[in-house]
A protein has these predicted regions:
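ATP-dependent adenylation/nucleotidyltransferase module used to activate substrates
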Residues: 2-275, 280
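ATP/NTP-dependent adenylation/nucleotidyl-transfer catalytic domains that generate, transfer
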Residues: 2-14, 40, 222, 251, ...
Length: 357
């Protein structure tokens, strides 16, 4: 029988990751209790989203069961939040008898996007395109690299021709710094099909960047979390996106020590979508109206263009909160329109390729 390759994210996961939902949540409660006893000076980010709802219920049940000290809860308001989310945060605080402090960024979403640009497709793609716009490296270097017989020599030449542009060269040429092709990784432009050709034929007329997330969420979080020993978040593997490489210990992606000496705890990391649905049904958890009434499947910074469903989601929100939809279009509209152009371009290219056989 042929061996099946399993990544370390799979092979190094703890045994409870494969338990059924009831047993898994029981195991997680024990883990929560252990870490809260060891690190009682803990802070938890509560977003008002569905993962956060499962997490706060699990944390508070565990606290009551093991008589553990209170957790500091914070809600980071980016400045572009639905009323449904803000109302739900208040209702959740009342439900559990806890305080959920609202924290606002020093640089708001409007200021951040005006100064740095707006996201497009993904955080990785936004970072790559932002650097390309800043460095002004021509897209033609990708053709040079593709056509070069000695790709390592060509990569070296490009480094000398465009100093201090390492990441941009790798991004555009879909290679690494040694000149080895890396066409199938997330850190290159063609991780989004035909993107390099698209921006060549339809250059963006606006600034692209995902720094709004840094300024409106990450910086605010670092400011508030710095005095706590343990930071608790609702991150889950089933969400996808960027994840850290696991260490040798099998709980590396659930519980880690940061370079600052703090601990980062993700109690829901191995909770699947099915586990989450079971918990909601079994304990009768009510999500915010954004889910239960509007019909959204995810929430966050309203209308963030990194979501491929951003425009569709805004239309679900519009009947209930037209003003926040208008604000999202004013802030992210250029990115929405450019995404629509890219999607149309991609489909046309796929159709053309299929017709040619």
């Amino acid at each position: 029988m042929k061996d099946v390759y399993r990544s370390k994210v799979y092979t190094d996961r703890p045994p409870y990751a494969d338990y059924d939902a009831p047993a898994k949540f029981t195991a997680i409660q024990s883990i929560v209790a252990k870490h809260l006893k060891q690190h009682p000076n803990a802070i938890c980010s509560y977003s008002g989203g569905s993962d956060s709802d499962i997490m706060i219920d699990l944390l508070e049940k565990t606290r009551d069961l093991f008589r553990l000290p209170p957790i500091k809860y914070v809600f980071f308001n980016t400045g572009l939040e639905m009323r449904a989310t803000k109302d739900h945060v208040k209702a959740t605080a009342e439900k559990y008898g806890v305080e959920i402090e609202e924290v606002r960024p020093k640089v708001g979403i409007v200021q951040a996007t005006r100064k740095y640009g707006v996201p497009f497709v993904s955080k990785i793609m936004s970072a790559g395109l932002s650097e390309w716009q800043k460095k002004n490296v021509p897209l033609s270097i990708a053709d040079e690299y593709d056509n070069a017989e000695d790709k390592q020599a060509k990569r070296k030449e490009l480094r000398e021709r465009y100093p201090k542009c390492e990441s941009v060269i790798n991004f555009l040429c879909c290679c690494n710094s040694a000149g080895e092709p890396r066409p199938n990784i997330q850190l290159v432009i063609n991780s989004s099909k035909y993107m390099r050709d698209f921006i060549g034929e339809c250059p963006p007329d606006f600034q692209i960047s995902a720094k709004c997330c840094d300024y409106c969420k990450k910086h605010a979080a670092h400011r508030v979390q710095k005095d706590y020993d343990m930071i608790i978040t609702g991150e889950r593997r089933d969400e996808g996106g960027m994840r850290s490489v696991p260490r040798k210990d099998n709980t590396a992606l659930c519980f880690t020590e940061t370079s600052s000496g703090q601990f980062r705890f993700r109690p829901l990391y191995y909770v699947s979508d099915a586990d989450k649905a079971w918990y909601k049904d079994y304990y009768g958890i009510k999500y915010s109206d954004a889910y239960e009434v509007y019909g959204l499947t995810r929430t966050g910074c309203c209308g963030c263009p990194i979501s491929y469903k951003a425009i569709d989601d805004l239309e679900l929100i519009r009947p209930y909160e037209p003003n926040v939809v208008k604000a999202a279009w004013n802030i992210f509209g250029k990115s929405y329109e450019y995404r629509q152009k890219y999607n149309a371009y991609k489909e046309a290219r796929k159709k053309s390729a299929a017709e040619k056989g």
